[in-house]
Amino acid sequence: FTQWYMDHVMSNIAAAGHSDLTNINGFYRNQWNGLDKSPVTSLLNVDGKIGFIPGSFGIQFYQDELGQENNTMMKLGYAYTLSPFSSGTVMSLGMSVSYFSKSFGTEWIATDGWENDPAIPQDDNTSSAVDLDLGIYISKPKTFYAGLSMTHLAETEFSEMSIKPVRHLYAMGGYNYPLDGDALVLRTNILAKTDLNASAIDMGVNVLYNEMIWAGVSWRPGDAIAPIVGFQYSMINKDATNYKEQLFRLGYSFDMTTSELQSYSSGSHEVFLSYSFKFESTPILNRYANPRVL
């Protein structure tokens, strides 16, 4: 996703709970518009702190369609938070278990026919596998973050398809630079990913104005340049017994293809929607008068 930096948990489970809020993040991406059966990807992430233990949870639902291929994945993860450093920096270690389902359709097109090709499924074919992800993540709120993670650690094979997911390594980092007090903040982000055979990198920069509006650009060398805009609105209500914090975020990006696909694709659209919250209550202690002073 072009707006990956709005939800680090999608690439690194150890980032769960670092915002101190419970987060519900959704992404929808329509890639390479103009191509028949181009990729359509949806993702829903939920993460937050677990009150009775020093850690956080992460739940992910992922669905992707590309041509005749359909992928569905569900993840359940936990991030253990170490004691904060004196500077306010927090480090976490995370692990997630995923259930991955892959299927292929039958609407194949080939100039020389496909009926007798053993490499092309003749019927609807579905297979599933269980996998494992690990990660480490460090951050200081509103200042910087860095993380390293590995997905498909078990490389469990889809037995009915003879397909094995390949391990992927992700390294991410970012820093926020105040430009005008708290009114303007320059936010930089970078994500490098590799399966040790091929590599890709995402670099982005955006400016957040008045904690409400942001705009910027993301660049994937050899693939796309993407303008990005977004809006957020926060509400904090508190009294003697209750504290309620809510944050709404909405983002949009448009990938302008720079690869050879630009002759066939009009670009890619992506929408990000998020709701974050924190509700706390302080119990009221009963008070009794002393009859000796009545």
Predicted segments, located by residue:
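Subset of outer-membrane beta-barrel
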Residues: 1-294
